[in-house]
């Protein structure tokens, strides 16, 4: 039998004591909330406020902490709010949406604690499209407005109609008179798929739409709704006198620059550069007027070959660039101050070896310790890292992963403490999550099964934990070789790896087994002198 001091020679035993009701805990991360798809309005995919997870401890002490069951597939990225006043206390909360039209508010640190769960109607059952089955409900990642305590989402119903909901993040109750039916001129909701993450900008919630399996007379749409009363305020059709032009973006939400301009990419369809804007990277005003665009010179042949340029969304990188990739594997860099129209990219090169009817996910961008990094995932190709020089991408990869996904690629996210301790997180089509050393890519730090993966899903990293949605669960991973608790809560939730016993004692008595259950375990502080240790 070993005590915790022997288990973790680097840990001070006082960290594990609960003495006179006071917990000695590890230092906490600075405030980090993940309230939108891919972390920020630039859609970098990087959480640069992660102070707990590092390449060193992920490589040695990382694993699954717990899993909560949900009632459907989780295509939307989980969102995270820390220190939320909910359930009679202050807690960290993860928000999870499913294709069954369920929304869950789970405790982000403890297994099985559901603060609320709402079902927003019977989901849609596609009959002729197998791209997303068996049902379609909440697909696009919601967005949270912390100032109003509101979560916005789109849900598709069995009738084919779609509704915009505004939910109170502490109760799940509808707000602002919602839900409202999503509609506009020419909009046939039954054939439109709300795939990209939602955007909240200047009191407007934006929703983007593509198609189900390219079926029917669909268009690409972006619709804007007032965030305080859910009234429609803006509507834009990508191909008003043509067809198609989906805004689906592999789930990526629109990007936004510092001037409030919106950036999206569009798929196959009609293009003329005046009214119809398929196969483009677009710069739009907040009122959804076209300000500028870039398009590949071979847009027509790409469109005819179902090589959607907009299979991913744009990522904004300093000082004034947007970057994206489509099915043809060409990585395209645009100057957002002068996008150049057809052939106007400042750089375009083939970043992968295998193209075809595949999906290119948006890059992840990170300013590392000595250079700027881009990480690129594309279906049927291994993930790669590239250097961004400040004005162009070095076309020779810095590193190439050994794992090659199928034609339905997972997503990438990155955690770092500013420019240090970068870890790249990848969800693979083999239902494994991989953690890479971002600076020394493709050095693999950790690999483990997540369950049954969902295509294009992105992990969420916040305050020492990684949250991943699957076909029927939300899984939580983190450091496993110490008892870890969030500060500032009345009860302590302790996590440890399986196969150990939690034992307690006071200053006078023997060690007594407190629980044989696997972690996490909730400890209620008392006024007695109580000490905890793990035994083997």
Where are these regions (language model features)?
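N-terminal secretory signal peptides that target proteins for export/translocation
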Residues: 1-12
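Sec/Tat signal peptide C-region and signal peptidase I cleavage site
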Residues: 26-31
């Amino acid at each position: 039998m070993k005590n915790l001091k022997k288990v973790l020679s680097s840990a001070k035993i006082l960290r594990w004591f609960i003495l006179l009701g006071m917990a000695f805990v590890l230092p906490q991360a600075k405030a980090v909330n993940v309230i939108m798809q891919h972390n920020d309005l630039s859609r970098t995919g990087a959480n640069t406020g992660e102070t707990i997870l590092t390449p060193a401890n992920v490589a040695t002490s990382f694993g699954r902490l717990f899993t909560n069951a949900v009632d459907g597939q989780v295509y939307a990225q989980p969102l995270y709010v820390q220190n939320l006043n909910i359930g009679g206390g202050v807690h960290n909360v993860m928000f999870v949406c499913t294709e069954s039209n369920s929304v869950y508010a789970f405790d982000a640190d403890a297994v099985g604690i559901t603060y609320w769960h709402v079902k927003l109607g019977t989901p849609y059952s596609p009959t002729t499209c197998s791209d997303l089955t068996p049902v379609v409900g909440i697909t696009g990642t919601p967005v949270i407005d912390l100032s109003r305590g509101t979560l916005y989402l789109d849900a598709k119903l069995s009738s084919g109609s779609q509704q915009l909901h505004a939910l109170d993040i502490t109760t799940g109750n509808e707000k602002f008179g919602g839900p409202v039916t999503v509609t506009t001129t020419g909009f046939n909701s039954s054939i439109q798929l709300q795939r990209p993450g939602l955007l909240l900008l200047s009191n407007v919630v934006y929703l983007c739409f593509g198609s189900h399996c390219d079926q029917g007379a669909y268009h690409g749409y972006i619709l804007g709704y007032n965030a305080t009363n859910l009234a429609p305020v803006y509507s834009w059709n990508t191909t008003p006198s043509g067809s198609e032009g989906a805004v689906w973006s592999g789930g990526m939400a629109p990007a936004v620059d510092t001037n409030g301009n919106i950036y999206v990419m569009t798929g196959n369809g009609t293009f003329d550069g005046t009214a119809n804007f398929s196969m483009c990277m677009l710069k739009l005003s907040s009122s959804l007027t076209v300000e500028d665009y870039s398009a590949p010179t071979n847009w027509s042949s790409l469109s005819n070959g179902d090589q959607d340029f907009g299979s991913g969304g744009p990522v904004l990188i300093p000082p004034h660039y947007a970057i994206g990739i489509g099915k043809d594997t060409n990585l395209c860099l645009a100057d957002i101050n002068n996008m150049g129209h057809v052939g106007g990219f400042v750089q375009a090169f083939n970043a992968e070896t295998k193209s075809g009817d595949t999906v290119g996910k948006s890059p992840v961008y990170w300013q590392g310790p000595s250079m700027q990094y881009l990480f690129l995932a594309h279906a049927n190709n291994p993930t790669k890292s590239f250097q961004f020089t400040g004005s162009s991408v070095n076309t020779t990869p810095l590193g190439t992963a050994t794992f090659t996904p199928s034609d339905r690629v997972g997503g990438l996210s990155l955690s770092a403490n500013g420019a240090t301790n970068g870890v790249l997180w990848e969800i693979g089509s083999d239902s494994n999550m991989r953690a890479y050393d971002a600076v020394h890519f493709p050095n693999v730090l950790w690999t483990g099964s997540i369950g049954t993966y969902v295509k294009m899903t992105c992990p969420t990293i916040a305050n020492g934990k990684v949250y991943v949605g699957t076909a029927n669960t939300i899984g939580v991973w983190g450091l496993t070789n110490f008892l870890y608790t969030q500060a500032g809560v009345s009860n302590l939730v302790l996590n440890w790896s399986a196969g150990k016993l939690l034992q307690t004692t006071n200053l006078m008595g023997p060690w007594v087994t407190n629980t044989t259950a696997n972690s996490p375990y909730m400890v209620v502080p008392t006024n007695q002198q109580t000490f905890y240790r793990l035994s083997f």
